């Protein structure tokens, strides 16, 4: 259990201002709160100066607590590195953050907001987050942590991307409007049950093959007791299930309402076609990120494509962990790995040993909750390598800085910038422009 290995501290911090989409909140002046959990290992001895601070991002609608067994396993297998702390925040519209913000949230969601929220969180707690920082992201959390690295290229020493949603095309299982598809399922699914036990039974297909520790956390954090703003009348819900006689059973719903889960997966583009002329006109105030080539489609999601197109510039080194049975487009992930970090401003990419892809055969998109040890294994090996590199770079930088003046420029400046000819301008000087 994480509480046995970590001291768990909860925080509430403000979200970033202004949000990417004006329709994300009821009013644009609403202040959102972000629910954060800080996991500090219960070290027996002093913490090394180079212990890692992890910043993690969860998948769509998946409570941050589901990843606690992953942190337990990572802590147990540390070798060649130490953990200073692990910080995970629920996205503003999901889980505990969403509950805090439910009177302020509206029906739009951008993946670009959470990277800014995390950056705000990091600066807020900077005294508790010494370098090196390592980013961890699963699913759309992998996209989020990558965009945080774009926002501040030198923030992270390395990234661990677990089946990240970074690709040009929609997944092969489809994001179209016709079933079957994840968005169809999300919108039309049942979202209220007569008890927590009934909810777990109804969702057993989702948790099939999960580690029991993750199943326990699913039962605790994925659902929420009624009443809620969506379901304020508990007795009416009980009557719906003919459960009024069972006074001990409390009906539950999803901790992240299905509507917020849906708009995190896909975004509406219902008004691009002018009803009078029939022409497609992108509403720039709300849909500036719409690709004009596909502006006629009613649903889209811009961040996987925009993030993919910038992969060449990714500065931190990066480990991609991909499920062999993932629903994502594996061929496009392979192409993303090839270009990752290879461009101007990037890490150097695969050719310089800064980017690596590991495929885990037989594992699907939810592998952090299935074969936890199998997922942690390549992470540990990669962190050992990258921490060796980090320590070497720190030593070299320290040596280079020895004896340097912090008050005047070094002599090379005077060698490169030649002196001005005498007799120019007033008093022999050329005036500055």
Curated annotation (Swiss-Prot):
<feature type="active site">
    <location>
        <position position="365"/>
    </location>
</feature>
<comment type="similarity">
    <text>Belongs to the AB hydrolase superfamily. MpaH hydrolase family.</text>
</comment>
<dbReference type="GO" id="GO:0140722">
    <property type="term" value="P:mycophenolic acid biosynthetic process"/>
</dbReference>
<protein>
    <recommendedName>
        <fullName>Type I acyl-CoA thioesterase mpaH</fullName>
        <ecNumber>3.1.1.-</ecNumber>
    </recommendedName>
</protein>
<feature type="active site">
    <location>
        <position position="163"/>
    </location>
</feature>
<dbReference type="Pfam" id="PF12697">
    <property type="entry name" value="Abhydrolase_6"/>
</dbReference>
<dbReference type="InterPro" id="IPR000073">
    <property type="entry name" value="AB_hydrolase_1"/>
</dbReference>
<feature type="active site" description="Nucleophile">
    <location>
        <position position="139"/>
    </location>
</feature>
<keyword id="KW-0378">Hydrolase</keyword>
<dbReference type="GO" id="GO:0005782">
    <property type="term" value="C:peroxisomal matrix"/>
</dbReference>
<feature type="region of interest" description="Abhydrolase domain">
    <location>
        <begin position="58"/>
        <end position="246"/>
    </location>
</feature>
<feature type="binding site">
    <location>
        <position position="60"/>
    </location>
    <ligand>
        <name>substrate</name>
    </ligand>
</feature>
<comment type="pathway">
    <text>Secondary metabolite biosynthesis; terpenoid biosynthesis.</text>
</comment>
<comment type="function">
    <text>Type I acyl-CoA thioesterase; part of the gene cluster that mediates the biosynthesis of mycophenolic acid (MPA), the first isolated antibiotic natural product in the world obtained from a culture of Penicillium brevicompactum in 1893. MpaH acts as a peroxisomal acyl-CoA hydrolase that converts MPA-CoA into the final product MPA. The first step of the pathway is the synthesis of 5-methylorsellinic acid (5MOA) by the cytosolic polyketide synthase mpaC.</text>
</comment>
<dbReference type="GO" id="GO:0016787">
    <property type="term" value="F:hydrolase activity"/>
</dbReference>
<feature type="binding site">
    <location>
        <position position="140"/>
    </location>
    <ligand>
        <name>substrate</name>
    </ligand>
</feature>
<keyword id="KW-0576">Peroxisome</keyword>
<dbReference type="GO" id="GO:0016114">
    <property type="term" value="P:terpenoid biosynthetic process"/>
</dbReference>
<comment type="subunit">
    <text>Homodimer.</text>
</comment>
<dbReference type="InterPro" id="IPR029058">
    <property type="entry name" value="AB_hydrolase_fold"/>
</dbReference>
